[in-house]
């Protein structure tokens, strides 16, 4: 009832918005005949006219009707494709900084050309964001003729490109790329050492395809650029050996710390806890292996790292499964995206988990990496002046889009009514019964020439069903992370009669399934004119045969954690008014039901006494499934919200550091900054030492003289000054010391040269800033990991985190000033003068991406230098 009530409210609001926007669609339609009469040249001249009008003070909304009419007419001439009214409606929504929910097959790619063109007129750039490189290349290639016809430039941003090519891509009016690459480029731009290396310009307008996958599903995983840390591979291998001897606590033991097992598993939060018995056992094993001293415990400060390794090893063995969470290929652990089923080469889990899994699978254990720069997608996309997004499934997440990103969700009606039949779920007691029912359904579809798409949640499940089909001699295609290269080809032909396609997490695949198979792909393989008509006739027969059979049939092998992912799978059928059907098969052994469904429901089903292979359709069970999904959705939303709350603290500090960095890089002369810092640092040090019992406390005076000599190369005798003038004030002493320091520094400047000293100042300032920021991020990680313990002291962990991180950040900024002045004060003039011919930037320090780099490999920053001579030198 509550959901229906919400839907009613949302629908009414949605209808009001659509009614308002439909008036704009009408005004665009009225311009259609006028624009059809324009010559190509006149139509193309509109771009220049629109830009001139913007310069004269008009806004984008003023230009929207004419600009959209221009794009529609240009598309008709270039592609022979006219934007439908619903696509125009979608374009208006996207320009209004909203999320447009458009069903699969409604032409989101063509819709995106409308707001992309309009916002590109400002000259500040448009970033079109896709889920993967294939989609970025495909969409850029497909839409470039249209944009170039209208006088706009189009760029493509790919991972393997040099920073010069990336810079060219970002300077284009419209740039295509993936969310990962845009985010990493932002981080890399804040690790450069000269303005010429910066690739991005201002973040103006981001148009995000599959926006729910990017802003919600991937929001829990931050982008991280990291560098190599100390070698601890031996420890991972040793700890891995003790895991088989530890026993997992039985589920019925409610007390996770005092049960009979050695450790307990919380599957909901993916965490593992050692029991008291487990703690004793682990300590005994570590003592036997001489990894821990006798007088120490596992929880002592010296052994925190050991405890971390033990928990990581237990998580690797009990919470992460081969061919579900990761693949083992070429002596590497390759992560599988839990939302899309795609592999993510080069990406590594943090906190030692990746190394623990490497030890578990007996592949080479690579060094841990230290975070050098990181940002979440939530905070990255909030940097844009304007963002919008498209997806086939957004309504269920409308609250999150609104509360976190300030984005309203608008449901765009389909161009043709949706006639797909969504059949009720069938629930079985066991996994085996469920699989038998699925196989029976597949055989029935084949008998009536109906194509079938079977959606699974893991590679393991897809391969298991594939084996069953092979035994039955049923031809089929498997689409999962292992066969990524054939993805587009498999999907293109998934609508052929009798075709059976098994797909792991269909979300974000980006290719429509056409009933009868893809005509375009068949024509591409046969370009002979005499064969084209035959191919078209054969395709028409196949298309009609599939329509007659009921269209594409979707089989869900189990419910996903999110209803939205289920809807994405269903949405593969019934595109553009096509016929189709869908059904989900479930069992009480499914992970969703096992972890989140209540014990009462499971007990009730057992008492029903179902016979073998008998399914149940009961309101209670249906309600239990919905409640289970809501539990997971709410939990995941809380995790994302908490991640954002913590990252917001770091984000404010990140903004300060990056703003300071960019200001430094863009400045040719920071002499005044150095003098100001010099004054602040010396004033603070002198005041601290001379604050107590001056001038009687000779010990403090001696300490000050030593510090000034050692840290700042200032050989000053304050005692002599006091002998000459007994009444000298502290303020006068401070002024005299600062004046001497400035004079000494000015002498260095004269000897080294004005231009050279400016280069040195800039280089030292940047290197010191990066070094301290790296250490600060590491300290923040440690603080974050243990801050929850403050709750036991009746303190709010979030407030404690904010307070401590602020203090840490303030201390870091003070230390930055101190180290810069100390370093500059101790410059070896003779050494510098003899090495002025060397490029100062050779010692610049940035580090590699999540992909671990060798010392002699080309540097991560794409400068062309070896890593050890560029970003790896810090």
From Swiss-Prot:
Q: What is its EC number?
A: 7.4.2.8
Coiled-coil stretches noted in the UniProt entry, renumbered to this chain = none
Which amino acids does the record list as binding ATP?
87, 105-109, 512
Predominant place of localization: membrane
Q: What does the entry list under GO cellular component?
A: cell envelope Sec protein transport complex; cytosol; plasma membrane
Where's it found, cell-wise?
Cell inner membrane; Cytoplasm
Cofactor names? Zn(2+)
Which InterPro entries does the UniProt entry name for this protein? Helicase_ATP-bd, Helicase_C-like, P-loop_NTPase, SEC_C_motif, SecA, SecA_CS, SecA_DEAD, SecA_motor_DEAD
Q: Which PANTHER family match?
A: CHLOROPLAST PROTEIN-TRANSPORTING ATPASE, SECA INNER MEMBRANE COMPONENT OF SEC PROTEIN SECRETION SYSTEM
Query: Do you know which HAMAP family this protein is assigned to?
Result: SecA
Q: What is this protein called?
A: Protein translocase subunit SecA
Q: Which organism is it from?
A: Buchnera aphidicola subsp. Schizaphis graminum (strain Sg)
């Amino acid at each position: 009832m509550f959901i229906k009530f919400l839907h009613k409210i949302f629908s009414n609001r949605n209808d009001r918005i659509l009614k308002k926007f439909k008036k704009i669609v009408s005004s665009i339609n009225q311009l259609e005949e006028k624009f059809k009469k324009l010559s190509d040249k006149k139509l193309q001249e509109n771009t220049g006219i629109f830009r001139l009008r913007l310069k004269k003070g008009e806004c984008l909304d003023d230009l929207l009707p004419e600009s959209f009419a221009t794009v529609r007419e240009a598309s008709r001439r270039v592609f022979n494709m006219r934007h439908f009214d619903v696509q125009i409606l979608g374009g208006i929504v996207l320009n209004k900084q909203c999320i447009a929910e458009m069903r699969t097959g409604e032409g989101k790619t063509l819709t995106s050309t409308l707001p992309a063109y309009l916002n590109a007129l400002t000259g500040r750039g448009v970033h079109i964001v896709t889920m993967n490189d294939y989609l970025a290349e495909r969409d850029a290639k497909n839409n470039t003729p249209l944009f170039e016809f209208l006088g706009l430039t189009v760029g493509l941003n790919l991972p393997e490109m040099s920073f010069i090519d990336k810079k060219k891509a970002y300077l284009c009016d419209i740039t295509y790329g993936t969310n990962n690459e845009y985010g990493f480029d932002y981080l890399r731009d804040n690790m450069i050492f000269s303005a010429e290396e910066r690739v991005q310009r201002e973040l103006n307008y981001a148009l995000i395809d599959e926006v729910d996958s990017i802003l919600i599903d991937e929001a829990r995983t931050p982008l991280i650029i990291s560098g190599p840390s100390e070698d601890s591979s031996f420890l991972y291998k040793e700890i891995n050996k003790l895991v088989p001897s530890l026993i997992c606590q039985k589920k019925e033991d409610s007390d996770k710390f005092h049960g009979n097992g050695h450790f307990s598993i919380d599957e909901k939060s993916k965490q593992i806890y050692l029991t008291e018995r487990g703690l004793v056992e682990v300590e005994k094993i570590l003592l036997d292996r001489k990894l821990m001293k006798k007088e120490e415990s596992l929880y002592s400060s010296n052994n925190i790292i050991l405890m971390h390794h033990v928990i990581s090893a237990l998580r690797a063995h009990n919470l992460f499964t081969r061919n579900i969470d990761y693949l083992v290929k070429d002596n590497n652990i390759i992560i599988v995206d839990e939302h899309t089923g795609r592999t993510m080469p080069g990406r590594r889990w943090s906190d030692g988990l990746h190394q623990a899994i490497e030890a578990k699978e007996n592949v080479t254990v690579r060094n841990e990496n230290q975070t050098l720069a990181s940002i979440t997608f939530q905070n990255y996309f909030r940097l844009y002046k304007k963002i919008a997004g498209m997806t086939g499934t957004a309504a269920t997440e409308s609250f999150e889009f609104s509360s976190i990103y300030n984005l309203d969700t608008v449901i765009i009606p389909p161009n043709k009514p949706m006639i797909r039949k969504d059949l009720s779920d069938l629930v079985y007691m066991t996994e085996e019964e469920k699989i038998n029912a699925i196989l029976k359904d597949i055989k029935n579809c084949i008998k009536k020439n109906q194509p079938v798409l079977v959606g699974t949640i893991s590679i393991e499940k897809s391969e298991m069903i594939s084996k069953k089909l092979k035994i039955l001699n049923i031809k089929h295609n498997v689409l999962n992370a292992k066969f990524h290269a054939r993805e587009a080809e498999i999907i293109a032909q998934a609508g052929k009669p009798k075709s059976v396609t098994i797909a792991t997490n269909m979300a974000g695949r980006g290719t429509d399934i056409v009933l009868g198979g893809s005509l375009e792909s068949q024509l591409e393989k046969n370009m002979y004119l005499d064969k084209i008509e035959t191919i078209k006739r054969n395709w028409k027969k196949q298309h009609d045969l599939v329509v007659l059979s009921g269209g594409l049939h979707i089989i869900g092998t189990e419910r996903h954690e999110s209803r939205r992912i289920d809807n994405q799978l269903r949405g593969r059928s019934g595109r553009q008014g096509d016929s189709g059907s869908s059904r989900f098969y479930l069992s009480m052994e499914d992970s969703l039901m096992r972890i989140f469904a209540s014990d009462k429901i499971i007990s009730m089903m057992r008492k029903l006494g179902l016979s073998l292979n008998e399914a149940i359709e009961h309101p209670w069970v249906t309600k239990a499934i919905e409640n289970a999904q809501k539990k997971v959705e709410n939990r995941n939303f809380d995790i994302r919200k908490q991640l954002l709350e913590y990252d917001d603290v770091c984000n404010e500090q990140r903004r300060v550091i990056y703003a300071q960095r960019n200001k430094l890089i863009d400045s040719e002369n920071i002499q005044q900054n150095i003098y100001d810092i010099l004054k602040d640092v010396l004033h603070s040090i002198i005041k601290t030492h001379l604050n107590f019992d001056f001038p009687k406390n000779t010990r403090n005076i001696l300490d000050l003289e030593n510090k000034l000599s050692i840290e700042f190369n200032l050989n000053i005798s304050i005692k002599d000054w006091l002998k000459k003038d007994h009444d000298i004030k502290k303020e006068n002493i401070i002024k005299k010391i600062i004046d001497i320091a400035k004079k000494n520094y000015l002498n260095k400047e004269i000897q080294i040269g004005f231009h050279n000293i400016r280069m040195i100042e800039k280089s030292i300032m940047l290197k010191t800033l990066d070094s301290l920021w790296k250490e600060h991020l590491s300290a923040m990680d440690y603080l974050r990991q243990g801050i929850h313990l403050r709750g036991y002291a009746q303190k709010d962990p979030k407030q404690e985190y904010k307070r401590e991180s602020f203090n840490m950040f303030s201390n870091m900024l003070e230390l930055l000033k101190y180290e810069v002045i100390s370093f500059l004060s101790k410059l070896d003039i003779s050494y510098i003068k003899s090495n002025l011919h060397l490029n100062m930037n050779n010692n610049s320090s940035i580090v590699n991406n999540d992909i671990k780099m060798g010392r002699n490999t080309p540097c991560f920053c794409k400068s062309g230098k070896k890593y050890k001579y560029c970003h790896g030198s810090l």
